[in-house]
């Protein structure tokens, strides 16, 4: 388990089998949150607002690598934001803690019941917010109702946040943002993201042929 702190938002890496995290009880938003688009922001803001109303700390629980990258290593979709940018966008919403849960074979094999009774308590989560289509656990066998049913006996609850749609009633998703970018429509992508899409990278020294022209 590793942790760092930036602008009062603590960032933690955690894997199945690690010790339980120290700290206060959390109201958390959970998801992959690639690109942190407007729909993601709605889920995260719901968790933050509830945490503040109850005097608790807020968190975002996300997965690293993206599950699709784990299962489709040869043809995984491109990331809308690298980890640094993703953390920056999430922190800007005002969350107290970002927890990156490692998506590995241990997590893949964790069934829905164990996720609720073991993983969420280890992270300190007491209340969870997720998109209405959220599924988790081995074979995606769990959903919001699963958390509420199993979590009732251990003090964990979950709330489904209605998926955000655009003016044409189409749900905003990371896949739609990627499609807009691939179609050469950055303005449409930015409307769904709620911010401009940026690319970061390292500048490499070239052959310096330009100075000979």
Predicted segments with their positions:
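N-terminal catalytic cores of NTP/NDP-binding nucleotidyl/phosphoryl-transfer enzymes
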Residues: 19-82
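A structural preference for short, hydrophobic beta-strand core positions in alpha/beta folds
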Residues: 60, 100, 160-161
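N-terminal Rossmann-like or analogous alpha/beta NTP/dinucleotide-binding catalytic cores
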Residues: 69-154
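Active-site cores that bind ATP or allylic diphosphates and position pyrophosphate for catalysis
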Residues: 117-213
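Positively charged, low-complexity intrinsically disordered leader regions
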Residues: 1-27
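A short acidic, often aromatic-flanked loop/helix-cap motif at beta-alpha or helix-coil junctions
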Residues: 17-21, 105-108, 165-170
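Short glycine/serine/threonine/alanine-rich loop segments
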Residues: 54-56, 95, 156, 195
């Amino acid at each position: 388990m590793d942790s760092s702190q930036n602008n009062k938002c603590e960032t933690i890496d955690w894997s199945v089998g690690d010790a339980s995290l120290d700290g206060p009880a959390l109201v958390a938003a959970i998801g992959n949150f690639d690109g942190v688009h407007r729909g993601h922001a709605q889920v995260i803001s719901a968790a933050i607002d509830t945490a503040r109303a109850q005097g608790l700390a807020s968190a975002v629980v996300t997965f690293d690598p993206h599950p699709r990258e784990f299962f489709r290593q040869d043809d995984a979709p491109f990331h809308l934001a690298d980890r640094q940018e993703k953390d920056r966008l999430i922190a800007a919403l005002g969350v107290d803690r970002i927890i990156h849960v490692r998506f590995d074979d241990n997590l893949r094999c964790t069934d829905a019941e164990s996720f609720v009774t073991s993983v969420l308590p280890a992270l300190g989560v007491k209340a969870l917010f997720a998109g209405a289509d959220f599924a988790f656990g081995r074979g995606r066998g769990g959903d919001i109702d699963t958390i509420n049913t199993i979590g009732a006996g251990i003090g964990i609850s979950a709330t489904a946040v209605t998926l955000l749609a655009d003016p044409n009633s189409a749900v905003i998703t990371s896949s739609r943002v990627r499609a807009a970018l691939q179609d050469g429509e950055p303005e449409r992508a930015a409307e769904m993201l709620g911010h401009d899409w940026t690319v970061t990278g390292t500048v490499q020294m070239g052959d310096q042929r330009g100075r000979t022209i």
